[in-house]
């Protein structure tokens, strides 16, 4: 039961239920979430390891995207949303009243289900966040564009058309551009909310290979409906059902020998 990381070589999976602080990127403790009178998450506690890919799986409407969006407080945008408990990023509670949400979202980048490039050039899409931060030096911006597009496995395909409109790219290329835009500001964590659900199989495979590369630089958390995808890309997997964390372990355990019957029933297609 070993996974492979190109940087670190073979390593035994961590016990995510007893993860030490120095290997933890995100700590979620006793997290409840309500939308008005409706409760969506129930007493969720878990630790997400840094430098790894963690997947949230579960049936539609189970709360996995809601949980993901707690990490960078995207749920704040939903009227009537109330969160209790804590979500800590490297030990600091992101729900502390002193937290600047814009700064948090620079530290925790996010990519959504459908590619959402801005109606700008490829170049301007990548540097958008840097310009918001006040970066003006052209050499700095140029370097960031190349670095980010290389990180997103897109540089060789677009290096000669950087000033063309991003809408001219294919769907798969647009999604990789969105990933490049997210990593350009060098976040510590990258959240992926079903990033391949709108893509064809070939583009999906490209994104999956990219995710494996990204974990050498970032902590990655992905929501996916596709269990085969979760098994392929994740080091650790959390099964969520009806707003509750049912089981959380290394991916090999979840997909081959889960401890909970609910998990086994979902993995084997008995429900969900």
Curated annotation (Swiss-Prot):
It comes from the Bacteria. It is an enzyme of class 7 (translocase). It is a peripheral membrane protein. GO terms for molecular function: ATP binding; ATP hydrolysis activity; ATPase-coupled phosphate ion transmembrane transporter activity. It catalyses: phosphate(out) + ATP + H2O = ADP + 2 phosphate(in) + H(+). Its EC number is 7.3.2.1. One of its GO terms (cellular component) is plasma membrane. SMART domains: AAA. It is found in: Cell inner membrane. ATP binds at residues 58-65. Disulfide bonds: none annotated. Keywords: ATP-binding, Cell inner membrane, Cell membrane, Membrane, Nucleotide-binding, Phosphate transport, Translocase, Transport. Residues 26-267 form the ABC transporter domain. GO terms for biological process: phosphate ion transmembrane transport. InterPro entries: AAA+_ATPase, ABC_transporter-like_ATP-bd, ABC_transporter-like_CS, P-loop_NTPase, PstB-like. The complex is composed of two ATP-binding proteins (PstB), two transmembrane proteins (PstC and PstA) and a solute-binding protein (PstS). Part of the ABC transporter complex PstSACB involved in phosphate import. Responsible for energy coupling to the transport system. Belongs to the ABC transporter superfamily. Phosphate importer (TC 3.A.1.7) family. This is Phosphate import ATP-binding protein PstB 1. It comes from Vibrio vulnificus (strain YJ016). The lineage of its organism: Bacteria, Pseudomonadati, Pseudomonadota, Gammaproteobacteria, Vibrionales.
């Amino acid at each position: 039961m070993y996974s492979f990381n190109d940087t670190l070589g073979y390593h035994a999976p961590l016990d995510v239920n007893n993860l030490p602080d120095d290997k933890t990127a995100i700590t979620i403790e006793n997290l409840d979430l309500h939308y008005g009178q409706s409760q969506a998450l129930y007493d969720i506690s878990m630790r997400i390891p840094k430098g790894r890919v963690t997947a949230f799986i579960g049936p539609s409407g189970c709360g996995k995207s809601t949980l993901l969006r707690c990490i960078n407080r995207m749920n704040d945008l939903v009227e009537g949303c109330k969160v209790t408990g804590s979500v800590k990023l490297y030990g600091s509670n992101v729900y502390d009243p002193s937290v600047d949400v814009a700064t948090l979202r620079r530290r925790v980048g996010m990519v959504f289900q459908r590619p959402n490039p801005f109606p700008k050039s490829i170049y301007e899409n990548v540097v958008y966040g840097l310009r918001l931060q006040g970066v003006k030096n052209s050499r700095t911006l140029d370097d960031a564009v190349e670095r980010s597009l290389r990180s997103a496995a897109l540089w060789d395909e677009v290096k000669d058309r950087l000033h063309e409109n991003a809408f001219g790219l294919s769907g798969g290329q647009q999604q990789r551009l969105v990933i490049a835009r997210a990593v350009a500001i060098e976040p510590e964590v990258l959240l992926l909310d079903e990033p391949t659900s709108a893509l064809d199989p070939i583009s999906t495979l490209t994104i999956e290979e990219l995710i494996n590369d990204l974990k050498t630089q970032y902590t990655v958390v992905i929501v996916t409906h596709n269990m085969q995808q979760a098994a392929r890309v994740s080091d650790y997997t959390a099964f969520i059902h009806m707003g509750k964390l049912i089981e959380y372990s290394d991916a090999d355990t979840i997909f081959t020998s889960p401890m909970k019957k609910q998990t086994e029933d979902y993995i084997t297609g008995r429900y969900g």
